[in-house]
A protein has these predicted regions:
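Alpha-helical oligomerization interfaces
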Residues: 12-16
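Acidic, polar-rich low-complexity tracts and alpha-helical solenoid repeat scaffolds
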Residues: 2, 6-8, 18-345
Length: 345
């Protein structure tokens, strides 16, 4: 009985090792060298939204869209002939066909790299080039220069942001696609020298999308991950501005007002003179918004449907919180009037 158990265990171990070896072959699954950020990145796309690595499959109607040759070496040589003749579009199609048909071949990583290079440099299609360079990182991470390829990804993301997306000779702003491109860069190379700049771009693009709360998460996370850089100082000021934009929309929320004021106080203490001046001004605006909301709340009790005593209590609380506020004089005068009338209606 024990011998059977040992044999079964050995068989299972062999099978699992074989499966692992197959899955770890370049081109079959995300490579063992593929590096992803292990920490959470609030403000990025969620796990359900993120673009996950997906292996290329041979196309339908292979006799039309498939490889021209019968083996990867001949197919690669054919692609090089096309490149030499300047037929870059056809070369790109057949390089892609090689990777799809023979993903584990020794020619596949170089074919994938040449495909990405042609799309970027010859066909000038940054969107497709980004996808192909990302595929190179995900499936051939050990067969390529990982850091150099990640740098190219970041550069392409900048091109995509600057040029927009062309559809039928018209250019459109592709804010969401560009943001996701920058997120892909950070997730694949979180320690790159440009990672903080990429996060700044992501937060700014979140603002352009109208997602101020998500932008704040990115700014805050950037400051935590890269606390000593120039980007952290920039993020602090931008976060202050964005928090004020949110506060203007939700000014009736006293808790949010107080949280924003506390944040601005800390931000001012950590900023240089120029940024501090702006943040102090923003804090003054937040304090006036809080006072105005408290004043309107106090006036709510000063009506015919409420007793004078409830109005007096509300006004006294307002003066305790804002003794030197803009509305303090008006509140004191009304308070004296209510008390002069006996404090009851």
């Amino acid at each position: 009985m024990n011998a059977k158990i040992i044999v079964c265990a050995c068989t299972a171990a062999v099978i699992s090792s074989v499966v692992a070896a197959v899955l770890n072959q370049p081109g079959v699954g995300p490579g063992a060298g593929a590096r992803y950020a292990t920490d959470a990145y609030p403000g990025f796309d969620s796990e359900d939204e993120i673009v996950k690595p997906s292996r290329k499959e041979p196309r339908l109607f292979g006799w039309i869209n498939g490889p021209k040759k019968d083996d990867p070496a001949s197919q690669f040589a054919y692609c090089e002939e096309l490149i030499g003749d300047g037929d870059y579009s056809k070369a790109a199609r057949h390089l892609d066909a090689l990777v799809r048909e023979w993903p584990t071949s020794s020619q596949a990583p170089e074919a994938q790299l040449k495909l990405a290079e042609i799309l970027l440099d010859r066909l000038q299609d940054p969107d497709e080039a980004f996808s192909e360079y990302r595929y190179l990182l995900d499936f051939y991470s050990l067969q390529c220069d990982y850091n150099a390829t990640a740098d190219i990804l970041y550069r392409i993301a900048g091109i995509m942001r600057e040029e927009g997306k062309t559809i039928l000779f018209f250019r459109f702003r592709n804010t969401v696609d560009v943001r996701r491109a920058y997120e892909s860069c950070v997730l694949r190379a979180p320690g790159a020298v440009w990672a903080a700049d990429a996060m700044l771009a992501i937060a700014e693009l979140r603002e352009e999308e109208g997602k101020a709360l998500e932008a704040i998460k990115v700014y805050e996370n950037l400051r935590n991950i890269h606390p000593g850089g120039v980007q952290a100082k920039t993020a602090l000021l931008r976060e202050a501005r964005t928090r004020m934009e949110v506060l203007r929309e939700y000014g009736y929320n006293r808790s949010r007002c107080r949280d924003t004021i506390d944040f601005l106080e800390l931000a001012a203490a950590q900023s240089d003179a120029e940024a501090r001046e702006e943040i102090v001004r923003l804090r003054g605006q937040a304090e006036r918004m809080l006072e105005k909301e408290a004043f309107l709340a106090a006036k709510f009790y000063d009506s015919r449907t409420r007793t004078a005593r409830s109005a007096i209590n509300a006004y006294e609380k307002f003066l305790a919180d804002f003794p030197a506020g803009v509305h303090a004089g008006e509140v004191k005068a009304r308070l004296e009037e209510l008390k002069a009338n006996g404090g009851e209606k």
